[in-house]
A protein has these predicted regions:
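An N-terminally biased module of ancient metal coordination in phosphate/nucleic-acid-related enzymes
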Residues: 2-93, 179-180, 192, 196-200, ...
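Extended substrate/RNA-proximal surfaces in nucleic-acid metabolism proteins
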Residues: 2-5, 14, 72-228
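Residue-level signal for threonine
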Residues: 31, 154, 296
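Alpha-helix N-cap/helix-start and coil->helix boundary motif
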Residues: 62-63, 106, 297
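Extracellular/periplasmic loop regions
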Residues: 277-283
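C-terminal helical cap(s) of enzyme catalytic domains, especially alpha/beta-barrels
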Residues: 284-288
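Conserved small/polar residues in nucleotide/adenosyl-binding loops
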Residues: 289-298
Length: 298
């Protein structure tokens, strides 16, 4: 069950409009359903143990873990929002949009996510071909071992395999040497459009949030274009405090949230105890949110 939508009740235009101050919300993390290493149940318990007061599981392009996450959260008294992180192509780059507090049985949303996932297998096979040409064979099969959901095989799964076989010492090194643009294992992909992604989330009763905007490397003009188009399509929030940003970036995106009238969101982008830079619930707080009305209830 989903509480009534309140997607526009608390804009981020005034940092004094707070609810509630200091809430430990972690609204961005991943499970084995996509490219994380913990189950939804394990994540729920880790979140509670770390003092999280409002939690969302946001697997890539997939809501298959939502029922387990909601049940686990309910069983331990942890407030929960449905979540997903949708892959979008914007200006020939991949951008991620987090959806929060939506109906995870919505047909249009499910069909859109299915279509978005559809190209991952072919992309992964092309990545494996590129790595084989660079002298590293067998990476598709190796990456598949790490993919809890074969439909969602990703660069992270390739990275874990390359660390396993000793090609690199850690995952960041794999990305730097093999999996970013211009490297042997990089394959671009056309994802959902920004318009469609926001529409799926909004029509399912949810809140659309730009994930970790500082990670895309956009120049100021392109970043402004992203925010402007996102707003034009009905986008409602932006991650201001995220484990994918550095602390000096938080004020910039707080200012941009106020400038564009977007709600501020917070999330660790946690994937694994051994890989993630920030643990669940370990970020500085944001001072405003408008997502409580989307909490799922038993």
């Amino acid at each position: 069950m989903h509480a009534p939508c309140a997607a526009s009740t608390v804009p981020a235009s005034d940092p004094q409009e707070t609810w509630p101050v200091g809430l430990n919300a972690d609204l961005h993390c991943h499970s084995v359903v996509s490219d994380g290493t913990l189950t939804p149940d394990e994540l729920a318990r880790r979140a509670l143990g770390n003092g999280v007061q409002l939690w969302s599981l946001t697997d890539h392009d997939e809501v298959g873990g939502q029922a387990q996450a909601a049940q686990a959260a309910r069983s331990i008294g942890l407030p929960f929002l449905t979540g997903v992180e949708v892959s979008v192509t914007f200006a020939d780059a991949t951008v991620h949009i987090v959806g929060l507090g939506f109906d995870d049985t919505d047909t249009q949303l499910l069909q859109g996510l299915y279509a978005t996932r559809g190209g991952r297998d072919g992309r992964a096979r092309e990545m494996a071909q590129g790595l084989a040409q660079a002298g590293i064979p067998g990476t598709f099969e190796g990456a598949l071992k790490y993919a809890g959901n074969p439909e969602l095989i990703s660069r992270s799964h390739f990275a874990r395999y390359l660390v396993e076989i000793g090609i690199c010492s850690d995952i960041p090194e794999v990305f730097r040497r093999y999996l970013t643009e211009g490297k042997p294992g990089y394959v671009p992909h056309r994802w959902a459009t920004l318009r469609n992604c926001v529409r799926w989330i909004r029509d399912a009763g949810g809140v659309a949030v730009i994930a970790h905007p500082g990670r895309y490397g956009f120049n100021p003009t392109l970043e402004y274009a992203l925010f402007s188009e996102f707003i034009a399509h009905g986008g409602q929030g932006v991650e201001v405090v995220t484990g994918s940003h550095f602390a000096h970036e938080y004020p910039k995106y707080a200012d941009m949230a106020r400038e564009f009238g977007l709600a501020a969101s917070r999330g660790s982008d946690f994937h694994s105890p051994h890989e993630s830079r920030v643990d669940l619930g370990a970020l500085p707080p944001v001072s405003y949110t408008h997502l409580r009305a989307h909490e799922t209830r038993g």
